[in-house]
Amino acid sequence: MQFHSSSALITPFKKDLSVDEAAYEVLIKRQIFQGMDACVPVGTTGESATLTHKEHMRCIEIAVETCKNTKTPSNSRMKVLAGVGSNATSESLSLAKFAQKIGADAILCVSPYYNRPTQQGLFEHYKTIAQSVEIPVMLYDVPSRTGVSIEVSTALKLFREVPNIKAIKEASGSLKRVTELHYYEKDFKIFSGEDSLNHSIMFSGGCGVISVTGNLMPNLISQMVNCALKLEYQQALEIQNKLFHLHQALFVETNPIPIKMAMHLAGLIENPSYRLPLVVPSKETIKLLEKTLQQYEVIV
């Protein structure tokens, strides 16, 4: 996986709640022009759980096409880490095969939610999906949403026994897990999935981030990651601290509710539309977002 900085993309909707494909392409191009290495369509932040199978695949297709046809400032191509998560292994497998066929560089697969599988079930789930494709696979551990964690021993077993399982997105909130994973397998790539811990994870064995805040501030997220990769601890910490209040504000309600509203307030999407059961943020949250964006001079 030849990338380090990436954003977990929101999925913009029109007022009729259909996917706004034109707006989606614009958002991806903004990521490209502001220095991100990769984009992550249709993950948690992309509201994948309320997209149809057809919409899910179309979002991956748009991301691949946009990245293929738009050069970065360094004349390279931004990578696509396609979200293929589902609580049904068969559906994830189908999405994984599609992502590979359409040209995604790698896939991100979350643990099945609601089912609460055993560790053996998780192992078989990930192994089955990974063996159906040739492109790299990133595990995604976010127990607050899935109800079950990929234990360190299970993650290590997957990395050791399934050749194209190359990385894990850590959104467990546990630095202990990060240090254990890195200690036992230095080549197992760890990506931060928790914006408030980006700096800490990068300096505890992490090699990159998948950021929600990056939708709004891709340039600063990219700069922080690049500083960390060069072992510029203090410079990376200064950027992390600069983003502290924004990271906090973007998670006062369930993601992606705040980031979508923030993107709307910043003029980056026309409609802050959500599909039920997600709803617009409270008036208090909107006021907080407005105040925070003013502090960052995103709006006046």
From Swiss-Prot:
An annotated Gene Ontology molecular function: 4-hydroxy-tetrahydrodipicolinate synthase activity
Superkingdom of the organism of origin: Bacteria
Positions annotated to bind pyruvate: T45, I210
Active site per UniProt: Y140 (proton donor/acceptor), K169 (schiff-base intermediate with substrate)
Catalysed reactions, semicolon-separated: L-aspartate 4-semialdehyde + pyruvate = (2S,4S)-4-hydroxy-2,3,4,5-tetrahydrodipicolinate + H2O + H(+)
Subcellular location per the Swiss-Prot or TrEMBL entry: Cytoplasm
One of the GO BP terms on file: diaminopimelate biosynthetic process
Keywords on record: Amino-acid biosynthesis, Cytoplasm, Diaminopimelate biosynthesis, Lyase, Lysine biosynthesis, Schiff base
Main location: cytoplasm
EC number of this enzyme: 4.3.3.7
Entries under SMART domains matching the protein: DHDPS (SM01130)
Residues at the site labelled Part of a proton relay during catalysis: T44, Y114
Cytoplasm among keywords: yes
Pfam families xref list: DHDPS
Biochemical pathway: Amino-acid biosynthesis; L-lysine biosynthesis via DAP pathway; (S)-tetrahydrodipicolinate from L-aspartate: step 3/4
Top EC group: lyase
The UniProt record lists the keyword Phosphoprotein: no
Gene3D superfamilies tied to this protein: Aldolase class I
InterPro entries in UniProt: Aldolase_TIM (IPR013785), DapA (IPR005263), DapA-like (IPR002220), Schiff_base-form_aldolases_AS (IPR020625)
GO CC terms: cytosol
Assembly and oligomerization: Homotetramer; dimer of dimers.
Similarity comment: Belongs to the DapA family.
Annotated PANTHER family: 4-HYDROXY-2-OXOGLUTARATE ALDOLASE, MITOCHONDRIAL, DIHYDRODIPICOLINATE SYNTHASE
HAMAP family referenced in this protein's UniProt entry, alphabetically: DapA
Function statement: Catalyzes the condensation of (S)-aspartate-beta-semialdehyde [(S)-ASA] and pyruvate to 4-hydroxy-tetrahydrodipicolinate (HTPA).
UniProt-recorded name of the protein: 4-hydroxy-tetrahydrodipicolinate synthase
